[in-house]
Amino acid sequence: MREIGLRVQPPAEVCNDPKCPWHGNLKIHGRYVEGIVVSDKGKKTVVVERQYYHYLKKYERYELRKSKVHAHNPECINAKVGDKVLIAETRPISKTKSWVVVAVLQRAERAEEV
């Protein structure tokens, strides 16, 4: 397991994904943000929605804005819909992915299926 430069707990599971920042050779750099996973339908991909405040000069107030980012979801982290995750910027992994999920900060409560 490598040290990636962030103060987060490494995942308990081990994977052999070469694009994993913990077990592969993917380096992270630049920004890192928190967000909520809104979709996990893609293969090893999640869509993370983050909220931020934008200042409106005319009204001298802030408004809440949202943006969606595609991020790589390694097998050892395995984030699901509703999870609060920390994503970090990295090199372009594909046409739309240049972020990777580094840690799950809070798991979503899921209903038990019977």
UniProtKB/Swiss-Prot annotation:
PROSITE patterns: RIBOSOMAL_S17 (PS00056). The keyword Ribosomal protein applies. It holds the Pfam family Ribosomal_S17. One of its GO terms (biological process) is translation. The keyword Ribosomal protein applies. GO terms for molecular function: rRNA binding; structural constituent of ribosome. InterPro entries: NA-bd_OB-fold (IPR012340), Ribosomal_uS17 (IPR000266), Ribosomal_uS17_arc/euk (IPR028333), Ribosomal_uS17_archaeal (IPR019978), Ribosomal_uS17_CS (IPR019979). Keywords: Ribonucleoprotein, Ribosomal protein, RNA-binding, rRNA-binding. One of its GO terms (cellular component) is cytosolic small ribosomal subunit. Signal peptide: none annotated. Gene3D superfamilies: 2.40.50.1000. One of the primary rRNA binding proteins, it binds specifically to the 5'-end of 16S ribosomal RNA. Part of the 30S ribosomal subunit. Belongs to the universal ribosomal protein uS17 family. This is Small ribosomal subunit protein uS17.
